[in-house]
Amino acid sequence: VIECSQEVEIVGEVKQVIVIRKYYPDGKGGIKTLRRGKEIAQGCHASIAWLSEKVRHGSKLTKDEEAWIQGAFTKICVCVNSEEDLLEVYQKALDAGLTAKMITDAGRTEFDGIPTRTCLAIGPNKSEEIDKVTGELKLY
């Protein structure tokens, strides 16, 4: 069980950014997009991946994570066009010391059995730190 402190001093805004990949190879030399429900499910997986890992390992929450859980659960969805773009944002987040979780779909319903990177979540961390990595990405 993960416990939060009774009160958390919030210094600055804390948020999570979900980065969704828009385009995928269709296997015929073209591109395709995901069904809207599939995109939403992938974003949900990303949003809770960090917390699931904390629970499995019995890790304590950071102050930013506690503030996010006790606050408004602020989430922003942005998009990138390709797997390469997704990997670039992921690496920038890791290099900046941010919480970042990549989601790879197993391929059972959309990708003919091929595991495929679909999205990632960055944070919860301080907004100004996340903005350094995602501030130029388009809202989705």
Regions of interest found by a model, annotated:
Residues 84-91:
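Short amphipathic alpha-helices within nucleic acid-binding modules
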Residues 5, 9-57, 66:
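Glycine- and Gly-Pro-enriched alpha-helical subdomains that act as flexible
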Residues 49-53, 57-73, 79-83:
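Compact, glycine-rich, soluble single-domain proteins
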